[in-house]
């Protein structure tokens, strides 16, 4: 097993253990984050119905330019405003196996600044 596969396997293990403890409901949906080397995206998901309630991504036209950490913070703010439009004020944060640092932390801080509670 190469280094890349080992890191991916470790993240998948963390992701599984987190998902056992976290489940989104209609009252408190799950805010999940996905990042690649180039993009960051986040979704608010109602696990009981299996639907996405709101989403934001760095691939959107108005969020494309800037540094990754700054863009992640803007994504958090945009996602929080879209959630407020759908009367969602509280969520459960799912870091999806990623370390709570850098882009992930910045996205969470941006969502908190815009009024989302978790």
UniProtKB/Swiss-Prot annotation:
SUPFAM superfamilies: Translational machinery components (SSF53137). GO terms for molecular function: 5S rRNA binding; structural constituent of ribosome. It comes from the Bacteria. Part of the 50S ribosomal subunit; part of the 5S rRNA/L5/L18/L25 subcomplex. Contacts the 5S and 23S rRNAs. The gene is rplR. One of its GO terms (biological process) is translation. GO terms for cellular component: cytoplasm; ribonucleoprotein complex; ribosome. The keyword Ribosomal protein applies. This is Large ribosomal subunit protein uL18. Disulfide bonds: none annotated. The keyword ATP-binding does not apply.
